[in-house]
Structures are given as structure tokens and as C-alpha cells.
């Protein structure tokens, strides 16, 4: 299968969600996943792993993080020889007429702007959905069978099975749904993680040039200007074991660590992280970056240590 990131390689390899999805897909026995990124000028549009064209793949996943990348997604499908609109693809799923599955923050924040391009959309976080979705997709031969997935797997939205009627001012008046499908597709969220998401691929082209580890998802503050604080509900902080296990995957030659989260971890976890880095990252001193601390109280001792680069 092909995994698309509709922006350049430096942004793709810096995106922790894209890296996590790449690992989850390749961990599956049903899937061999190859990446595509939006090509820069005069770059060939081929998979990064084997240099195959997009049209060779019968299954395409797209990870959409930003609204500015919507046009890039359509351009990538056209450049790869794939009909951009789902309605223009034949019913039978095959190379040249692939099944297009879209997910990511941009999708579950508002799926409708991209619904015309997608045969299937994942509304929510990938980890709870993929264990059931991937075997179902592997057995799929025709797009008409997608309604069974939409009816049985939470978080799976089949746009072609829903039709909308609008008022004159553009508001939705009525939604008609195919038989057996839910009236509303509820967003799904991971309850707890045994292993915090972390960098799977390290590249000198990545932004900030660091090994990233996720502290949790969501934020309890609910600032009205922040979409992420609302779409990643409920707010969750990963356990110390999950975060330290994620940090433990760091290659020994990497000296820059990023701890990512919309809400800072509690002091006990920060103490554990600081102790872990001091013990397991010698003799090379590790520099850590907390890009967003909100208004969380931050102990002065961390700022006085060699562990923090703010």
C-alpha cells in the first residue's frame, strides 16, 4: 500500500503522527507500506522505498494534518495517475483504481472538504481503528463492500453512503444515510498507550533535528482559539513507563530530544525523564526541548540543568 503525506519530505519526516502511522501499517501482517511525499520541483513522484509509481498500489492511505495541504493531496493523486474524485473510480479495487483512505487531524477536525476524494475516512486516532480495519481492507475487492466496514468498525466514515441537503444559506437541512450505517460517525480515541509515540525515522532533513517522544494527547484548558485542545478529547497523559519506553528507543548517537504534548507532564514524570536521560544517555549530554509548556509550573532545577534547551 501507499502512504501519502501531502507536503515535502522535511515536513513529513518531522511529523510524529505520520511516522507513527507508517510503523503501525508496516507492523501489520497484511500490509507492506511505502511512502510518498509532495515532490519539490523536478523531483520524481515515486515511492521513497522502491521508487514505484502511485498507480501500482491498489490501496492508498493519506495522512492530512493541515488545511493548506488539501490541494496537494488532489495534485498527488492526479500526478500518480489516480482519479482524484472517488465517484470516478470503478467499483473493483485494483492497481490503477485504488481504494483511497484518508485520516489525520485535518480529517477528523472536518472531514467534508475532503470527502469527494475519499472512499473511506478514519475519524479519530489510528491505534484503536487499524487492528480491525486493516484485515477488513485486505479482504476487500469492491468499493460497494465498504458499507459493511462503515457499519461495523467505529470511526470509519464512508462518504458515498451519506447524502446532504442544504438550506439556501448553506446550512445542512437533512442527512440521508444508507441502511445499516450510523447517523453520526463518532470520533474514536486511544484510551492509554503502552509505548509513547516516538521518532521511527531520523533524518538530517527533519525540522529541528531531534528525537521526538509524545507525552500525551489533548489539553484540559480548552482555550477557544485552539482546535487541537478540542479534537484530542479527552485529554490524556501517558504513563511514566510508556514515555520512558519511547525514550528508550532513541539511538545512542542522537543528542537532542523533544518531549511533545499540548499539556506538560506532571512533576513526578518530569523527574523520571530527567533521571532517565542522565543515567542512560551518558557520556553524551542530551539536550531536551519542551516547545509548549502552557502555564504549567516548571521547576527551576530543570532550567538550571544541561537537560533543557528552551
Tell where the protein language model's regions lie, with residue ranges.
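Conserved SAM/AdoMet-binding glycine-rich loop
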Residues: 3-4, 8, 244-310
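Canonical Radical SAM [4Fe-4S] cluster-binding loop centered on the CxxxCxxC motif
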Residues: 15, 205-239
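A short beta-strand-loop structural module common to alpha/beta enzyme folds
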Residues: 29-41
Amino acid at each position: 500500500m501507499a502512504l501519502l503525506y501531502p507536503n515535502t519530505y522535511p515536513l513529513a519526516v518531522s511529523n510524529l503522527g505520520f511516522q507513527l502511522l507508517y510503523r503501525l501499517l508496516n507492523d501489520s501482517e497484511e500490509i507492506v507500506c511505502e511512502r510518498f511525499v509532495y515532490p519539490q520541483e523536478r523531483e520524481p513522484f515515486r515511492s521513497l522505498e522502491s521508487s514505484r509509481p502511485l498507480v501500482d498500489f491498489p490501496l492508498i492511505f493519506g495522512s492530512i494534518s493541515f488545511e493548506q495541504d488539501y490541494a496537494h493531496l488532489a495534485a498527488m493523486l492526479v500526478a500518480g495517475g489516480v482519479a482524484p474524485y472517488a465517484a470516478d473510480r470503478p467499483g473493483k479495487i485494483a492497481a490503477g483504481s485504488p481504494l483511497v483512505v484518508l485520516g489525520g487531524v485535518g480529517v477528523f477536525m472536518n472531514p467534508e472538504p475532503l470527502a469527494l476524494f475519499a472512499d473511506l475516512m478514519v475519524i479519530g486516532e489510528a491505534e484503536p481503528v487499524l487492528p480491525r480495519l486493516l484485515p477488513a481492507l485486505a479482504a476487500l475487492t469492491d468499493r460497494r463492500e465498504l458499507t459493511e466496514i462503515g457499519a461495523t468498525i467505529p470511526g470509519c466514515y464512508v462518504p458515498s453512503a451519506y447524502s446532504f441537503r442544504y438550506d439556501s444559506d448553506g446550512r445542512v437541512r437533512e442527512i440521508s444515510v444508507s441502511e445499516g450505517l450510523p447517523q453520526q460517525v463518532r470520533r474514536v480515541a486511544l484510551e492509554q498507550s503502552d509505548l509513547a509515540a516516538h521518532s521511527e525515522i531520523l533524518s538530517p532533513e527533519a525540522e529541528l533535528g531531534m528525537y521526538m517522544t509524545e507525552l500525551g494527547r489533548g489539553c484540559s484548558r480548552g482555550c477557544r482559539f485552539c482546535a487541537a485542545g478540542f479534537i484530542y478529547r479527552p485529554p490524556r497523559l501517558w504513563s511514566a513507563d510508556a514515555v520512558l519506553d519511547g525514550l528508550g528507543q532513541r539511538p545512542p548517537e542522537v543528542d537532542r530530544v523533544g518531549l511533545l504534548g499540548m499539556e506538560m507532564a506532571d512533576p513526578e514524570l518530569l523527574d523520571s525523564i530527567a533521571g532517565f536521560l542522565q543515567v542512560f544517555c551518558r557520556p553524551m549530554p542530551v539536550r531536551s526541548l519542551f516547545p509548549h509548556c502552557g502555564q504549567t509550573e516548571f521547576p527551576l532545577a530543570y532550567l538550571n540543568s544541561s537537560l533543557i534547551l528552551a
